[in-house]
Each structure stands twice: as C-alpha cells, then as structure tokens.
Amino acid sequence: MSKRYLISLLAAILFGLGAFFFGLRMDLRPENQKPGKFPEQVVFVRATDDVVSGGVMFTSPKDASKPLAIIWVHGWGANFYVPSYVGIGRALAERGFTTISANTRMHDIGNVEKYTLSGKRVRGGGYWGVTSEDARDIAAWIGFAEHLGYSRVALVGHSAGWASVGRYQADSKDQRVAGLVFASPAVGPSTVADDPHLLAQAKKLVDEGAGDDLLRLPNRSFPSFISAATHMDIITTPREYTDFFGTQTPNPAITRVTCPIMAFFGSKGDIAGEKALNLLKSSVQRLSQGPRRVETAMIVNGDHEYVGEEAQVAQTIARWAEAELLTR
C-alpha cells in the first residue's frame, strides 16, 4: 500500500469525521416541506425604475378565499423560495389567504437588478443593493395583487424585511395596505457604533463613482463585506427609521402608520423575544400618533426562520388578520 494512498485515505476519513461532527453541532435535519394542496405559480413584477422581481403565489381555494392578500418580504441575503417561506405561504393558502412570497432588489447576497440603456450593470442584493429603493418593488407587488382583484393586502416583513415594509407604509400611507406584520424585527436603534474610517472609505469610493467596490466589515466572526454605496445608504438612514418604533426617538416613522400592526419572534434562538415585544408595544402605545392596535406573539419552538413551525406562523397571521383586518 503506497504512502500516497494512505495519506489520501486518512484525509478522507478526517474529512468524513469533520463533516459528521459539524452536522451534529449544526443539528442538521432533512428538509421536510410538504407539497402544496392548491395552485402555485411563479410570478414577476416590474418596478417603475425597470427592476424585475420574481416571487411565488400560493392561491387559496375560491370557495374559501378571503378578500385580503398576504405579501411576504424576505430578509437579508434571502429570497422568495426559502423553504420556511414556502411552507408558510402554503399554510396561509390553506387558511384562505392568497399569499405572495416576493423578492425585492435586495434578494440574496448579490444579484443583477438590471442593465441600463447604456449597458451598465446595476447590482442588487445584500452586498450591493440600496435598501431605501426597494419600496418601488413593494409598490409593484401591491399593484400586482390589486390587478388580481385584491384591493387590500397585509405586508409581512421578515428579519431585515421588516424595515422595508415599515418604511414603505410610513412614507406612502398606501390605503391598500390593511395591516403590517413585523416578523423578527429589530427593536430599537443599533447599539454598534459607526466606524468613521469605514464611512470615510465608503464616501470616497462613492464620490469617485466606485460605489460597487466592496468594503470588509471589521470585527466580524467570519469574513463579511458590503459595497460602499450600500454602506452609505445604511449609515445615512435617518433615525426615525432606525428607531422605527420610537424606543428612544420622540418622532419615529411609526407615527405615520395608521393601520394595525403585529410583531412576533420565535421562542428558540431568535434574535430577540418577549422583552423586545413588550418594548415595541409600550413604545408605540405611548406615542400620540400611529397605530392604535398593536398585537404581539411568540412562535413556540420557532427559530429565526421558523423551521418546523410554519403552520404556527400561518395560524398566528391568519387569526390576527381575521380579527383585526377583516372584521373592522
């Protein structure tokens, strides 16, 4: 038996053991989404600035369909076909709510939004997208639902998507939006101090027309990057949006939202929990303006993606929508 063969065999064994123990540490489990019971269709919209976004529509049965569509907006680095999003969409359709799991220009880590007439590539996604522009995509999805006959929708923003749906409604006051759901949102402004060196780098690159260039974010446990233009967009976001619920801000953007809102977290390893929900609710209710009806819930055994608890998420949203949006 050759020395080279022994080394190769040992490497294979070590790799296998490493994969096994990594799997144990990560608590890997097989994907377990059940097939949908009702029609599902891949759909597309085009925003006013010519950015095309894809999504999937879960259509409820006609004899049980509610007069309200649900539009689910993904989180950072995600997309419309995240397995738990699909499971939630299917479960909502079973409960009579036609649901659209929708991409915005912020989907995935990186994407190509479009090409300009001059042939320039415009990038999007978590590394390159300009978050403040995804309101155009949300408006396009609401228009799509309206074209299907739904004059009222509920917007659900998951993880980073909460900020997109909240800012959209605060700025637009869209009368077609009957309610907002914040699924695992950030409550309160970031406690991480801005890095002046990183900001200076970003500003210099943007001023030089190199906003697509990537910056490496310091002090991260794994390599993390962001484009100069995206970083500038985030850093210059007004505090009324970064402290959307008014935990420390006297005039937050939520004061311009009048529809009912709901927020929830998973109880198992989500980014926050009941303490944050209580802070959100008390902060909004002390304001002189804004939504008067604020509901909160915990998704029992749910993680940040609600894996395995998709039906519970759907039931939570459906009950709230039936009580707050369809009976008033």
Where are these regions (language model features)?
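N-terminal cap/lid segment of alpha/beta-hydrolase-fold proteins
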Residues: 26-62
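Short, surface-exposed "cap/lid" segments of acyl-processing enzymes
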Residues: 62-108, 113
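Alpha/beta-hydrolase active-site loop
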Residues: 117, 122-148
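Primarily recognizes the serine-hydrolase "nucleophile elbow" in alpha/beta-hydrolase
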Residues: 143-205, 209, 236
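Accessory cap/linker subdomain of secreted extracellular hydrolases
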Residues: 183-251
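Short beta-strand/loop motif that positions the catalytic acidic residue
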Residues: 257, 263-265
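Conserved alpha/beta-hydrolase "acid-adjacent" motif
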Residues: 270-280
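Catalytic active-site module of serine/aspartate enzymes centered on a nucleophile-bearing elbow/loop
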Residues: 295-328
